[in-house]
């Protein structure tokens, strides 16, 4: 199973995904590169791809730094759970949902010259998003212990495992701490997705997709400061035993940096958003023109996004019954898996949605031709990536991640998971465009139905294969490491689902 690819990378999907402030010239570059004049599909997709590429590259640097300190093990599992636990907010209220329920309506209002109605609609959406997202975040903070227990029931008995020396840290207790920081961070990132929706509707693509760089940089700064404060020798930990208490403090510092990064990611977009809206009235009124229509579109999208979210949570739930490091291996592989989806799928899909929404319903042939051309563009770029990952994925993983506590065994297990994900890469990437094509036609039910079926099949296959592959280890397959302590490959079975 694989999580839904999202632009922001608190990943992630994405990955990401999701990521201090960018240089002051970024906003000016965005204004120059994405003028009010109608951008061509290719140039708009190029702007989106440029922003996503910058965010993903700095995200890879972030993951390499995290791998250096935590490797693939108990601490990295807690880090990944901290990002995934509040993903309900990100996936149900973030960019994917706003693409269906906000951008088409806002774009049509702007195209019809109803600038004041569009601004009032945007303000109402922001108000409603803020109320819902921060309410859920508050519940997440108050009931973090329940959230962790439900998502990772296999961690509840960690106190005994620490006593026996099986693992270095009580993952359950540490996860509760970081989840309480992760929920507010994700609520802020949801508001950042609203800003992205406004900018995309006005064809301002570059700034909105560069903004996650701020999140990633904030995490890197927090990691560096934390390492300086808590570790005796931050630059010489390869192969050495680092006190678990120090690594736990470092992990908490990382999530504090995530909150700061969320504020920065939203903040770099707000000045441009406010200039575009001109008349801006935040509210929580359902009587504002367009809001009820948006809510009607929102409900089936939430069902579809909820299905994807269930898939991601099933990965987390099932991985708790596998050996330590399974969740980290899945997440490290997903970072690479989501890169071509973001660059070649999401970039085209995001830039095409406002344009497809503007095409008259009477011009179906024009609509289909635009979708067909964009689909060909995506596959032309993705198919070579599939071949490259399968043939050279081990080298890619090694170059990007193998450092410090991240060793050769870790590289092999992440490569095997990446290869499993890669088998479905072309289909997943193309689905991003097709999903947005349905949204542009005001059809949010069809993608939701497809998502539910996809998740059901994925869960059944992944949970069965997980048990088969968990009997194998890296030592069994490639003879690397020690037979008694070699990393297991149960995560590969989950990825194949």
Regions from the PLM with identified roles:
Residues 2-497:
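Membrane-embedded alpha-helical bundles of multi-pass transporters/translocases
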């Amino acid at each position: 199973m694989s999580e839904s690819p999202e632009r922001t990378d608190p990943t992630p999907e994405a990955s990401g995904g999701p990521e201090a402030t960018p240089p002051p010239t970024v906003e000016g570059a965005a204004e120059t590169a994405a003028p009010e004049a109608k951008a061509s599909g290719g140039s708009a997709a190029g702007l989106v791809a440029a922003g996503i590429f910058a965010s993903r590259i700095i995200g890879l640097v972030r993951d390499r730094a995290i791998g250096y300190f935590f490797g693939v093990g108990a601490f990295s599992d807690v880090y990944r759970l901290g990002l995934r636990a509040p993903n309900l907010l990100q996936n149900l209220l973030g960019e994917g949902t706003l693409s269906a329920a906000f951008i088409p309506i806002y774009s049509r209002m702007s195209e019809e010259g109803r600038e004041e109605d569009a601004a009032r609609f945007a303000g109402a959406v922001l108000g409603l998003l803020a109320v819902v997202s921060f309410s859920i975040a508050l519940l997440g903070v108050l009931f973090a212990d329940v959230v962790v227990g439900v998502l990772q029931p296999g961690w509840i008995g960690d106190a005994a495992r620490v006593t026996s020396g099986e693992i270095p840290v009580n993952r359950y207790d540490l996860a509760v701490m970081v989840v309480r920081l992760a929920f507010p961070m994700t609520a802020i990132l949801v508001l950042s997705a609203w800003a992205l929706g406004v900018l995309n509707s006005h064809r301002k693509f570059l700034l909105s997709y560069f903004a996650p760089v701020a999140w990633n940089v904030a995490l890197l700064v927090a990691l560096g400061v934390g390492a300086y404060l808590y570790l005796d020798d931050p630059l010489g930990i390869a192969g050495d035993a680092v006190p678990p208490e120090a690594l736990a403090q470092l992990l908490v510092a990382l999530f504090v940096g995530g909150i700061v990064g969320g504020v920065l990611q939203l903040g770099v977009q707000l000045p441009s958003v406010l200039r575009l809206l001109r008349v801006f009235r935040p509210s929580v009124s359902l009587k504002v023109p367009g809001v009820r229509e948006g809510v009607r579109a929102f409900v089936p999208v939430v069902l579809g996004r909820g299905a994807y979210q269930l898939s991601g949570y099933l990965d987390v739930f099932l991985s708790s019954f596998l050996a330590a490091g399974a969740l980290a291996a899945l997440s490290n592989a997903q970072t690479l898996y989501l890169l071509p989806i973001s660059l070649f799928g999401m970039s085209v899909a995001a830039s095409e949605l406002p344009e497809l929404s503007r095409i008259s319903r009477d011009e179906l042939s024009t609509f289909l031709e635009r979708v067909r051309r964009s689909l060909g563009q995506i596959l032309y770029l993705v198919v070579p990536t599939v071949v490259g990952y399968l043939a050279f994925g081990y080298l890619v993983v090694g170059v990007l991640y193998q450092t410090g506590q991240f060793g050769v065994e870790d590289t092999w297990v992440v490569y095997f998971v990446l290869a499993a994900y890669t088998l479905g890469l072309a289909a997943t990437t193309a689905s991003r465009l097709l999903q947005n094509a349905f949204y542009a036609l005001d059809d949010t039910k069809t993608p939701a139905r497809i998502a539910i079926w996809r998740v059901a099949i994925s869960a059944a296959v992944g949970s069965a294969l997980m048990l088969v592959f968990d009997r194998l280890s890296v030592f069994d397959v490639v003879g690397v490491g020690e037979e008694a302590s070699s990393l297991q490959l149960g995560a590969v079975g989950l990825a194949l689902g």
